[in-house]
């Protein structure tokens, strides 16, 4: 597997790793290896007894990870939603000192036209995080009903012209050759959008929505968060970077819910043992951070990012 030459600047790099409160002999998980920015910084802070396990479902990321020659480091090819399974298989559940998740699409994925994520560069209409599995965006759009496309654009892109765009996509696929290129789709969306926002391409929300749907991103994140909390040691840290409001709302809600104890409706007689069986709070929120103005100026893609850090409650 060859790698591309597109560079990637990790957003909130120091802040996300600092949020893990690295112990030199600790065990850490980088659930989204990408191009290894966070992993390399974590390794630089680990001692000889420390261990870092990275996960990524992108074959290009795996190729980059395989170039790291360090006995403390290992890479797993697969979705981060399976984090609990991977760590259970390694016999490390409850022993992990920190999990880092950097959500969304990496710069190399966006910048490589062959991956089909960007409306700014023409390429195959793919959008899969792992191009070796699942259906591409083009395949889905070719067979999807207008109502299904409308729902995806509204739900995952908050696109106000979702119905117009969906109608245009279905009409195009029925009357002409199906959409197979990113530029074809971007141009179609532009034509179908009656109002253009300043400083934002008309296809921005639709491309985001289709990408999230094709990769089941929000479901993957929810499973990854649940798995991450389950494998953390007492006082272990969870450090999560999100890049748009849908991701951040999900992360915020998850940390909030995991910070509460069981809610017992008034008037229901339960013994202390029964209340304990309902479970207890597992996380405490540490802090929320956004990038500095300097970082946003140097890396505009950092603009909408949010870092949230939480800690596993010691039982």
From Swiss-Prot:
S-adenosyl-L-methionine binds at residues 36-38, 56, 80, 102, 109. It catalyses: cytidine(1402) in 16S rRNA + S-adenosyl-L-methionine = N(4)-methylcytidine(1402) in 16S rRNA + S-adenosyl-L-homocysteine + H(+). The keyword Cytoplasm applies. Its EC number is 2.1.1.199. It is found in: Cytoplasm. One of its GO terms (cellular component) is cytoplasm. GO terms for molecular function: rRNA (cytosine-N4-)-methyltransferase activity. The keyword Cytoplasm applies. One of its GO terms (biological process) is rRNA base methylation. InterPro entries: RsmH, SAM-dep_MeTrfase_MraW_recog, SAM-dependent_MTases_sf. Keywords: Cytoplasm, Methyltransferase, rRNA processing, S-adenosyl-L-methionine, Transferase. It holds the Pfam family Methyltransf_5. Specifically methylates the N4 position of cytidine in position 1402 (C1402) of 16S rRNA. Belongs to the methyltransferase superfamily. RsmH family. This is Ribosomal RNA small subunit methyltransferase H.
């Amino acid at each position: 597997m060859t790698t591309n030459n597109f560079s990637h600047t990790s957003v909130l790099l120091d802040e996300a790793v600092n949020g893990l409160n690295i112990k030199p002999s600790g065990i850490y998980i980088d659930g989204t290896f990408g191009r290894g920015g966070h992993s390399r910084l974590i390794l630089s802070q680990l001692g000889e007894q420390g261990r870092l396990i990275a996960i990524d479902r992108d074959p290009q990321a795996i190729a980059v990870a395989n170039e790291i020659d360090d006995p403390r480091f290992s890479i797993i090819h697969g979705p981060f939603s399976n984090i609990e399974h991977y760590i259970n298989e390694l016999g490390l559940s409850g022993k992990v000192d920190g999990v880092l998740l950097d959500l969304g699409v990496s710069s190399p994925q966006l910048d490589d036209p062959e991956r089909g994520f960007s409306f700014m560069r023409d390429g195959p209409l793919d959008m899969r995080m792992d191009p070796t599995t699942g259906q591409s965006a083009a395949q889905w759009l070719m067979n999807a009903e207008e109502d299904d496309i409308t729902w995806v654009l509204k739900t995952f892109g908050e696109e106000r012209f979702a119905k117009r765009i969906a109608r245009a996509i279905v009409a195009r696929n029925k009357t002409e050759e199906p959409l197979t290129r990113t530029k074809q789709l971007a141009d179609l969306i532009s034509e179908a959008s009656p109002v253009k926002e300043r400083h934002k391409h008309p296809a921005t929300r639709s491309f985001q929505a289709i990408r999230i749907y094709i990769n089941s991103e929000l479901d993957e994140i929810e499973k990854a968060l649940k798995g991450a909390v389950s494998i953390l040691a007492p006082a272990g840290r969870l450090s999560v970077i999100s890049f748009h409001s849908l991701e951040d709302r999900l992360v915020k809600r998850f940390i909030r819910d995991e910070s509460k104890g069981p809610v017992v409706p008034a008037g229901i007689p339960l013994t202390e043992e029964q209340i304990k069986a309902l479970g207890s709070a597992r996380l405490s929120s540490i802090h929320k951070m956004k990038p500095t103005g300097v970082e946003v100026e140097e890396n505009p893609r950092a603009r909408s990012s949010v870092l949230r850090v939480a800690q596993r409650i010691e039982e």
